[in-house]
Structures are given as C-alpha cells and as structure tokens.
Amino acid sequence: MAGEADGKAPLGSRYPPAALNERILSSMSQKHVAAHPWHDLEIGPGAPAVFNCVVEIPRGSKVKYELDKATGLIKVDRVLYSSVVYPHNYGFIPRTLCEDGDPMDVLVLMQEQVVPGCFLRARAIGLMPMIDQGEKDDKIIAVCADDPEYRHFRDIKEIPPHRLQEIRRFFEDYKKNENKEVAVNEFLPAEDAINAIKYSMDLYGAYIIESLRK
C-alpha cells in the first residue's frame, strides 16, 4: 500500500509516522531484571540517622501490604480483622536486616498518605520496642525528612503524647481479633533508634559478605 513501504504515514492518516528513538531501541534490545527495593535501593548517605525507606502500607489503610521477598513487588498479605487502620505510613529500610530475617520496620509520621511501593527520606526520632507473639519485632519511629510540618522533629519526646498513644494502641490492638498477642514497651529516644538501624545495616552487610563466600 502506498505510503507504507516507504515508512510514511498513509494518505488521510490522523497520526504522524512513528519516530523510533535510538534510546528506546537500545533498551528493548537488552534484558533487564527488575530492581529489588530491599537490595537495590541505596539506604542513603545520611544513614543511619537519615535514610531512604520504602512504604508498604499507607496511612489510613486497613489492608496489610508487605514486600514479597522473591519478586520485590508489594503484595496484599491480608486485611486487618479489626476496625483499626494504620495511623501512619509504614514500611521498611533497604539494605538492613533484623534477627527475624526481615528488613528493619519503620513507621513514618508525615502529613499525607503515600502509595505503596514508593520511597522517601526519613529521619529516625525514636524506637518502639515490641514483642509479637513472643518474638522481638521493634519498630523505628521516624518523620519524613522532606515534610515541612514534621522535618524539624529530632526526638520522640517532641511528639505530642496523644500521637504516641495512638501508635501504641494500634500495635497493641491490631491483632487481637486474630488471637495474637503483641506487647509494646516504652518508647526509646532517637539515639537508640539510630543504634538499632546501624546494627541492622551491619547485619545486612555481614550477610551479604557471607553469601558471596558460598
């Protein structure tokens, strides 16, 4: 058909001829592996005090999303059995490792909810020691480092008490209807949170080195 063999748009076509960008062609010719948010995302130059974190669960959600370790995608783990919702954005810190085999958990205080799978810069302000069904499951309490309403906070003692009580009550109650017991201890200051993150970074590094030796 006239116009097709010479690469021009047919007469009467509403669309211009497609221009094939060399960068697009080169990207199509290569095999790509999707980046894994736990292992491929940098923790950030300011870590352990200021760090990147990946949000799994947005504030106000009743759905518990979590990282699927095999694929690096965010999957639906379950819908909470009770009527409570996550009080703040919740996720994990990349390139960290805890004794339970998971990355370090973090709860990020900020003005808005954000979508699962995005990452943001956070500042550690405290540590919430927690025991989940007899196992240690501590949470870092942080603020969004790029939120003008929260970025000035440096320690958990600066957060209004009712906010901390809201966080405590959520984690104490969100598994009750599943007949699972969770105990939350007293909040600890920013120094303890930073030390916990540093330890999890070291543990991750040691694990990677050990894996390379095998």
From Swiss-Prot:
GO annotations of cellular component type? cytoplasm
As for subcellular location, the record says: Cytoplasm
Cofactor or coenzyme needed: Mg(2+)
Gene3D superfamilies, sorted? Inorganic pyrophosphatase (3.90.80.10)
For this protein, the Enzyme Commission number is: 3.6.1.1
Catalyzed chemical reaction(s):
diphosphate + H2O = 2 phosphate + H(+)
Question: Quick one: which residues bind Mg(2+) 1?
Answer: D100, D105, D137
Q: Does the entry feature the keyword Cell membrane, yes or no?
A: no
Top-rank taxon of the source lineage equals: Eukaryota
Question: Where do the annotations place Mg(2+) 2 binding?
Answer: D105
- What are this entry's molecular-function GO terms? inorganic diphosphate phosphatase activity; magnesium ion binding
Q: Which UniProt keywords apply?
A: Cytoplasm, Hydrolase, Magnesium, Metal-binding
List this protein's GO terms for biological process: phosphate-containing compound metabolic process
Indicate which residues the UniProt annotation says bind substrate: K64, R78, Y90, Y174
What Pfam families does the annotation carry? Pyrophosphatase
Q: What class of enzyme is it?
A: hydrolase
HAMAP family in alphabetical order: Inorganic_PPase
Q: Which family does it belong to?
A: Belongs to the PPase family.
**Official protein name in the record:** Soluble inorganic pyrophosphatase
- Record organism: Oryza sativa subsp. indica (Rice)
